[in-house]
A protein has these predicted regions:
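Loop/turn-to-beta-strand initiation segments
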Residues: 55-56, 105-108
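Interdomain hinge/linker at the junction between the two RecA-like core domains of SF2 helicases
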Residues: 2-46
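Amphipathic alpha-helical transducer elements in NTP-driven molecular machines
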Residues: 44, 68-71, 95, 108, ...
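Conserved strand-helix element at the start of the C-terminal RecA-like helicase core
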Residues: 49-74
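Short glycine-/polar-rich loops that comprise or flank the Walker A/P-loop
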Residues: 4-7, 80-82, 122-125, 153-159
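Conserved segment of the helicase C-terminal RecA-like domain
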Residues: 10-17, 145-169
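A short beta-strand element within the Helicase C-terminal
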Residues: 108-110, 116-132, 158-161
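Conserved helicase motor
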Residues: 62-65, 84-96, 110-118
Length: 169
């Protein structure tokens, strides 16, 4: 029956800690959120709720040029004591920033797909900003989603695909 209703099924085995993979949620926002002309109440609420629960947030953006703009946007939306930074492949301070995030000295880290694999953070939730963007391939979205819930003592979390519409893919 499944084969009749979908194009493809991807089977992902259970993780080593025997907990299921967190399932991404889709949140539709108006398109002006993605060009930073309108604040997103959803993003603001999402981050505040995570911080209240002592969780961190990785926000994936599709292009390097969006990193700095996203940080400025978030700093204007959130309180001053929240520590926000960004990292991308050619960032000279990339290792230092990732370590600070790992050490919980950064609350929100905006990043490109450079962190889609090879890193493990606990107490982590993820937003994928403009998830329908061409730079977020199906495999990239799966890898990014895999950042959440990697520890046996923190085996769940939230993943949100933020978009202005649901694409056919």
């Amino acid at each position: 029956k499944i084969k009749d209703s979908v194009d493809e099924v991807i089977k992902i085995p259970i993780r080593y800690h025997r907990y299921l993979l967190p399932v991404p949620k889709i949140k539709i926002e108006k398109s002006d959120v993605f060009d930073f002309t309108k604040k997103s109440k959803f993003i603001e609420k999402f981050i505040k709720e995570r911080l209240a629960r002592n969780r961190r947030t990785l926000i994936f953006v599709p292009e390097i040029g969006m990193c700095k703009t996203s940080v400025l946007y978030l700093k204007n939306s959130l309180q001053d004591d929240i520590i926000i930074d960004f990292v991308y492949s050619e960032d000279e301070n990339r290792s230092e920033k990732i370590k600070k995030f790992y050490d919980r000295k950064i609350d929100i880290l905006v990043t490109t797909t450079i962190l889609e694999r090879g890193v493990t953070f606990d107490y982590l939730d993820v937003i994928i900003f403009d998830a329908k963007h061409i730079n977020f391939t199906k495999s990239a979205l799966i890898q990014i989603s895999g950042r959440v819930g990697r520890k046996d003592y923190d085996n769940s979390g939230d993943i949100v695909f933020l978009s202005d519409k649901i694409s056919g893919e």
